[in-house]
Amino acid sequence: MTARRNLSCQPLSDMVSEGGGLKGAGFRHMQEQPAGREQSSYQPSPNVVSYLGRLEYLRNDVPVNDDAGLPNKVPRRLSDTDLEILKAQRVDELPPRPVRDSLMDAFWTRCYPWTPVVERSWVNERGPKQVSLLLQHAMLLAGSRVSATLPDYQPEQFYKKARVLFWTNAEEDPIIITAATLLLHWWNPDGPERVSLDTSGFWLRICTGLAYQVGLHREPTGRADAGLRRRIWWSLVVRDCLINAGHGRPRALDLKLADVSPISIVDFEGAVAPANLFSSYVGISCILGESICCHQTAEC
């Protein structure tokens, strides 16, 4: 049995000041963790580089170095216009603690087993003001979709806040952005017969683009966050298969270009039950997706 790992990350988008307002910079690092607490094995890089696959099709004798000459990333400050938009949408306002805990419990119990893209340490080991607002609203959205309706805390409210945080680039960590965007699939206000920028099919394409940029389609050999990356990738594959089957839309992902290994117990830090459940879910979804593709292309 593999030892459990703590695959957490430091949030970059805490825009809430101690007084509850929005900060001009929009970002700050976590404070140092107390002594005795296990340090995170997933640390966001100050100079996040997207995946480049040029060396996979260029000959070895072609002098290409994708990592050379990369400029240091300058911390981005939200513009005054961005801050006004975020303030108007009241993105820094979260539900009261009892409501928040209830929705988070619903997320972990009913959503996470099927979309295991969030590390518990991202949320449980931090206060609300130390967690990505984009991630929090995405999780609250998902939790509210599988809970009894609360008149004052509708799913649409969480969705709109997460959406504006996404489009204003309030979150910088691409892994958290991808995970949160995957959770927006739980909001699907319109049927497939309507053209919409708010459906799961739309966000699927956004997630696909992010996944390829981050390189989630490649086996994360030797990475501390390998299990997290595999879970995010296969969660995206599942959504692609289900949307393909439910809506009849072409697949967004080409699995022939991916070499990510199947889900295993290691990816769930040694937890057998959730690993087996998600692995079976992925397998069934892939069979369904391949069957639909065969029918659509008349290959069967």
What are these regions (language model features)?
Residues 87-281, 285-300:
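Acidic, Ser/Thr-rich, low-complexity intrinsically disordered regions in fungal proteins
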Residues 2-110, 211, 278, 282-300:
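Intrinsically disordered, low-complexity activation-like regions
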